[in-house]
Amino acid sequence: DGLAMKAVKMVFENLPSAYENGANDPKAREEMANASCMAGMAFANAFLGVNHSMAHKLGAFHHLPHGVANAVILTEVMRYNAAEVPTKMGTFSQYQYPHALARYAELGRFAGCTGNTDEEVFENFIAKLEDLKEKIGIKKTIKDYGIDEKYFLDTLDDMCEQAFNDQCTGANPRYPLMKEIKEIY
């Protein structure tokens, strides 16, 4: 967890300047390279989740760049994962329910978010992520990237099935149903 948490903190601290100033801020770019390396080491040992599975399909079907695809759906997936009682839970049988809300709140606190409850910290963390996305030009919705709505809807069932079967999905804190993946998209 330490590598992932430190990487998140470094992204918040450095991505806006690295994006806005590019080569004129080599320190921010260096810190982003380090954050990327740390994040890679973290997920190589812990795997990813349904956000990544869904992003794979947005890239494959609609040619969205992988980072953009991950970013545009991130907060919706976080809200899905943070639900108190999931529809289905079975991948990690040692847990009655996932503890995603508490874990997101822990990460939010580490990134500087405050609140009186985990729910408040989580909502502040979501707001901080949305602010970061806006600063670096991530659009609000998939549709905002110019994807034809009819084509998107025509491919949605295939995307959902493939995202459900993606190797990353099994590591998600909540094991999604295909209809839930569709609702997130």
Locations of regions flagged by a protein language model:
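Short coil/turn segments at secondary-structure boundaries
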Residues: 1-3, 27, 120, 143-146, ...
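Alpha-helix N-cap/helix-start motif at coil-to-helix transitions, marked by capping-box chemistry
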Residues: 1-9, 48, 68, 98-101, ...
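Intrinsically disordered or highly flexible coil/loop and linker segments, enriched in small
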Residues: 20, 42-48, 87, 116, ...
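Carboxylate- and glycine-rich phosphate/diphosphate-binding segment that chelates Mg2+/Mn2+
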Residues: 1-46
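Glycine-rich phosphate/pyrophosphate-binding beta-alpha loops
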Residues: 37-70, 165-171
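Short, amphipathic C-terminal "tail helix"
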Residues: 149-185
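Gly/Pro-rich interdomain helix-loop hinge
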Residues: 61-64, 68-151
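Short alpha-helical scaffolding segments that buttress acidic/His motifs in well-ordered protein cores
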Residues: 4-7, 32-40, 54, 74-78, ...
